[in-house]
């Protein structure tokens, strides 16, 4: 006999909670919206993929998301399908979908790039490879957005071929000395931690010599620099690691298993992208299509 709560009752309770904590969105007649034509010169012509917020505006948006996520976490809706031993409710993914179907009807703070990366990629990767102490240290704080984490994967000469990365990790007792540069890192300026894939062994095939670390951004030898876009914003960052001494307790997964950690994280990224609705920062999808045809 199933011990799962009735999903319709679960959805009803979620709706009640949302009504008490968020503003409902106006109902949209999708048929009428579909019939509307794009008229040049009317409305916004912004079809940008990336936003152009100032750091102050970006931080204000992030703080709004953090406040919402803390509410959501405390009410039990942030880790619905996470295992109970990690602080979740242990429910199937169908309950997540049921909750999200209700949440989409409400005005929720816009997440931007960092929160989905932090909660959808970094936290589950820690859950997959972390020690009990690491899971306790990072999973729930990330899912409540008390802290944020980003990916430190790409390098100037290692983008699509990630396994060719050269950021070096050399063991020195109970520490690792990291040296190298990461690039195109979304959200690094507002993150407390970064999941870095490094090369710890140059004498084995490139996929086998990688090791993963959780790198604290307030650490000596860790520097974050924004990459300014021509449009004025700075969605991406460079992260420089210069003799950054990282404790072995921050290593995620076994030595030499960084490739497996990276693939797992990228797998979560694909899952997250496929389950999310198509969206971008600028105008409607119809505007993008119209601009492409113009």
Please tell me what each predicted stretch does.
Residues 114-133, 159:
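N-terminal glycine-rich flavin-associated loop
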